[in-house]
Amino acid sequence: MQVLIRCLEWLALGMNRLAAVAAVLMSLFVFLGVVMRYFVGAPFAFSDEFIGLLFATMAFLAMPLGLVMRRHIILDIVTRGLQGPLRHFVDIGATVILTTFCAWFLALSYDFADYSRLLDARSDIGSMLLWPWMAMLPLCTVVMVLVSLGQLFDSLRQLAGRPSLFSLAGEEEVL
């Protein structure tokens, strides 16, 4: 199980690096669009669509690392005062809720991307093929489901008094 957790951590790190590349490309196209608007009179015709697709790609590629590091949004106003087994039970419940949501989102986003592929959907102005961009949603969600299942297993281990298998989570976030 430890090897699987390490692989998921490395995959999340790699996805985060790709998210950084998408962010740099997005910034570059915004900058080029502004420069071209002043010197040429208009930006690339497809730049607004491309920037939107890069933004969605960046956001979804960055999510798994946030989950691995437990740096996502949490409601700690309730759990801040909890200690010991009760805190682990709350963490297990939260992980089950997240896993359920991700599985549901995975099914819907897969159908969405597949239907886009069947229609050969393209963007309005740039006529860019959309289904590869839409496929990022279910692909990233699969990784999130795997990470949350790993965290569920890890929380059960910690409930039994064993140390966490996740090395990227900070000491204060590990329950």
Walk through the language-model features, giving the residues of each.
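Alpha-helical transmembrane segments and membrane-interface helix-loop junctions
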Residues: 1-175
